[in-house]
Amino acid sequence: MKKITIAIDGFSSTGKSTLAKQLAKELEYVYVDTGAMYRAVAYFAMQNKFIGADFFNKEALIEALPKIQLEFKFNSDLGFAEMYLNGENVEKQIRTIEVSNFVSKVAEVSEVRSKLVEQQQEMGTNKAIVMDGRDIGTVVFPNAELKIFMTASAETRAQRRFDELQQKGDNVSYEDVLKNVVERDYIDTHREDSPLVIADDAIEIDNSYLNKEEQFAAVLELVNDVVKID
């Protein structure tokens, strides 16, 4: 069976990671959550007081980039790889609303994107990989054999994210989550370096009214068309 690169891009909280994990498991491919990488850098910036509600010391973050070591380590109990920042498991810490509030601002920094894109491209050298993010099909793997672009209404995405955070025990309001989603959309689509856009050869999926099973079945069919699975 031909091994391919699958690029999944789209807006925040569209279920990119969930779909990518499902595909990687089904195909026995490597899964890389690039959003976790940017979240880890944002968390690092927060911990080192480089960014806050009303300030962002980009120069300090850029200077500290060589000190940031990111690594995915597979957790057999959970069935997926967790993010490690300088040797520490930060999978839980990077999923908070606080990190969500800053991740798009950190991802705007060209030096951050350059460092992470290079690392992501190295991960995909041997294909057989599913990678999700904002610029996978346009920048990281412009020659990917299959490109998916996922979208849904801001309200639908905010509700999904709110429900997820509630299940984790995070005390947040729907209004705050919706505000975060809208702000991230604007920053992601308006940044100068690698803005969020749909690749010319990507297949767009609006999953506002699709459940996970319907979405997975549709995308798996697309994969089968590309790799010619009988």
Curated annotation (Swiss-Prot):
It is found in: Cytoplasm. Its EC number is 2.7.4.25. GO terms for biological process: nucleobase-containing small molecule interconversion; pyrimidine nucleotide metabolic process. Keywords: ATP-binding, Cytoplasm, Kinase, Nucleotide-binding, Transferase. It comes from the Bacteria. NCBIfam families: cmk (TIGR00017). This is Cytidylate kinase. It comes from Flavobacterium johnsoniae (strain ATCC 17061 / DSM 2064 / JCM 8514 / BCRC 14874 / CCUG 350202 / NBRC 14942 / NCIMB 11054 / UW101) (Cytophaga johnsonae).
